[in-house]
């Protein structure tokens, strides 16, 4: 099948042309191809399927439940909404609960049900966090960095654990980072660290910052904190929740200037994503969704109720150049979980996961493996 007459997102920009789909993969991207059955895109934009490397749940299901049926439901919702690959994030919970969830992820990765987003990784969000900046994490299960516990979970995930989070100020964080970064990306998260403490962990091998601005100190001219330490290291990529509630539009634009080509848009979506207002749970705590905002009973903002596609569109609406917004939701997150050669781009040989959209990025159609959903 040939797709012609579109604006194809290749190499960080939109280029007039087309591509073929052969055996579920891209072929002849922006190149001439033999005549055959074709689709006229009529000038529509085509972007890669999105990659969400930090999503907890949707449709009433949560990754940490460890329920296979729920994970399938999550993956189907994501695919329908233009997110064709994902790495679900766990919560701060007992190790045996996390191990069950990770083994469930391995099962979905292997089976790869038709019509579902591809599970290509896991983000281990917790339990190595600061109590002061725990946010919506359950304080009862917070722990100091423990490489042996991490290794147990890494083995349970059979190579799928791609991001592990840690608060730099905790005892043992630097040594943990040195060892864990040999196996996966280490991210600074849920932290009250000083600039110096954060810098030590980045210099030990951390290359990621979980949900920039949230659950960490803000920038102060005498105390630049983890944001200052991260921004001046070109090896560090920063996640950003762009649901319109977690981060002000001005701070969204600032992030793209502080971290050029190093912003990774995420949803941080909870099980209430795609659901009506009401009461839900997160890591053993009640969460209340009202007007698109999810909060704990004490008013603390929890994760989001938005999917990544909506977050990408929000970024563009807030003034981020469209090309940068698309990169931040596709190629950059794919890179962060070590899957740049498998997803996140429109290139010969990669799975034909793509979204047909208009100039405002409004979806017209989603294709997974070259098949329209």
Please tell me what each predicted stretch does.
Residues 1-33, 360, 367, 372:
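N-terminal metal-binding scaffold of metallo-dependent hydrolase/deaminase domains
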Residues 6, 335, 345-373:
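C-terminal cap of metal-dependent C-N hydrolases
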Residues 45, 53, 63-117, 141-156, ...:
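Alpha-helical scaffold segments that flank or form the walls of functional sites
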Residues 56, 72-101, 117-130, 157-169, ...:
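Divalent metal-dependent hydrolysis catalytic cores, especially in the metallo-beta-lactamase
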Residues 76-87, 130-158, 200-212, 223, ...:
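Active-site gating loops and adjacent loop-to-helix segments of metal-dependent hydrolytic enzymes
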Residues 155-275:
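Active-site core of metal-dependent hydrolases
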Residues 228-238, 256-267, 272-356:
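His/Asp/Glu-enriched, well-ordered alpha-helical/loop segment
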